[in-house]
């Protein structure tokens, strides 16, 4: 993804130059409808670039899958630190397509409303929060769009409103805490089912709708006419296969201890057949209810099929006999989703929050999907799925938008 990384560095340089030249009178100031076009990404970890450092999975050591190195999440102008700690806006994030300027405002853990998590990390929502120098993503978008020609906004939001992370934790805990002859499923835990009541689905759909409308307000405040920019609303991809598609048996603990995918078959089937469709339907219903001009839906539910975590069609680096992520064909033989880590990652470069997120290859696939949706500026929606094996000229997995 060399071309995409060069585009990102160009973005950093432009941001730094803008800061340096404050007060100078440009001949033609960029802004609504003026200047090079930009795509801005907003939302949560499924668009911020979470886990984008790692290409595939390995239990033999980090070096075999470390595609970006220790600066992967450093998104400030100098590429020396995170702008917001633990937002994990990686340099492989999908908005850096290589075909159009990209700017990443998304933050891992974000919900529709701004909050501070239990560990004290600030999580900007799709709102106009402003306090102590911290801002919501809608306000950040408004500021950026006023001085850049934003032609499209890509958004992923809603998963954390449904407490996706806690659900995954419950599923893995139940897998590890019960035997195969008497499995304890997470899909009937009260803490899980509470997220999928009719009342909560309605409430979260409304919250997502409100977040999307805040994006329109931000663009209006920045001087954009409705319809002069496009909103690309993406849903969520399936990260694990159905029960029959795992390459590790659910008997014993290998599924988690080796594969990092501790789900009972029954829970994996429920996740793909009920939980994911419910969340994705809420996202799409919210987009429809918001009624924002030039809204396009980018459907990703099946985008990673065949490359999902622990799927029988792929494997760990060592299971496939590869020297490392850089080996020819690695993109087609290894997983596009990061392993689930449930214990302390102290002493390693891994983060628990990277669990079950699109990795370096996954981010590249999503970037290709977004490129196809961008469509040279004639933005379109559709269903994105895997294309032919191999990589395109930008180092991304081949994808198809239909």
Where are the regions a protein language model picked out?
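Mobile gating loops/cap/lid regions near enzyme active sites that modulate substrate access
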Residues: 238-357
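Secretory targeting and sorting signals
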Residues: 1-29
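Catalytic nucleophile-elbow at a beta strand-turn-alpha helix junction centered on a G-D-S/GDSL motif
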Residues: 37-54, 65, 160-162, 360
């Amino acid at each position: 993804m060399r071309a995409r990384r060069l585009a990102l560095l160009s973005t950093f340089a432009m941001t730094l130059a803008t800061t340096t030249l404050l007060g100078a009178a440009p001949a033609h100031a960029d802004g609504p409808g003026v200047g090079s076009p930009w795509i801005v990404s907003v939302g949560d970890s499924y668009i911020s670039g979470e886990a984008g450092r790692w290409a595939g999975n390995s239990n033999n050591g980090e070096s075999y899958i470390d595609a970006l190195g220790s600066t992967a999440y450093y998104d400030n102008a100098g590429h020396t630190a995170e702008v917001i700690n633990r937002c994990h806006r990686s340099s492989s994030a999908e908005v850096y397509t290589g075909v159009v300027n990209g700017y990443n405002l998304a933050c891992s853990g974000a919900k529709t409303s701004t909050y501070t998590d239990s560990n004290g990390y600030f999580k900007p929502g799709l709102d106009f929060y402003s306090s102590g120098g911290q801002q919501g993503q809608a306000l950040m978008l408004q500021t950026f769009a006023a001085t850049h020609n934003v032609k499209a906004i890509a958004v992923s939001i809603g998963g954390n409103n449904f407490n996706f992370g806690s659900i995954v934790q419950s599923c893995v805990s139940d897998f590890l805490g019960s035997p195969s002859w008497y499995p304890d499923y997470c899909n009937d835990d009260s803490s899980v089912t509470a997220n999928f009541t009719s009342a909560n689905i309605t409430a979260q759909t409304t919250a997502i709708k409100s977040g999307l409308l805040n994006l329109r307000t931000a663009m209006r405040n920045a001087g954009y006419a409705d319809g002069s920019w496009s909103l690309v609303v993406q849903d969520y991809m399936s990260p694990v296969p159905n029960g029959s598609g795992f390459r590790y048996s659910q008997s014993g603990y290998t599924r988690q201890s080796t594969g990092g995918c501790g789900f009972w078959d029954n829970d994996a089937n429920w996740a793909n057949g009920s939980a994911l469709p419910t969340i994705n339907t809420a996202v799409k219903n919210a987009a429809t209810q918001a009624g924002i001009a030039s809204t396009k839906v980018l459907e990703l539910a099946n985008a990673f099929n065949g490359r999902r975590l622990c799927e029988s069609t792929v494997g760990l680096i060592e299971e496939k006999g590869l020297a490392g992520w850089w080996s020819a064909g690695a993109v087609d033989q290894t997983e596009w989703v990061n392993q689930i880590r449930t214990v302390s990652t102290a002493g390693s470069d891994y983060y628990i929050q990277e669990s079950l997120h699109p990795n370096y290859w996954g981010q590249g696939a999503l970037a290709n999907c977004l490129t196809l949706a961008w469509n040279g500026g004639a933005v379109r929606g559709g269903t994105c799925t895997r294309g032919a094996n191999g990589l395109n000229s930008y180092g991304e997995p081949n994808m198809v938008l239909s």
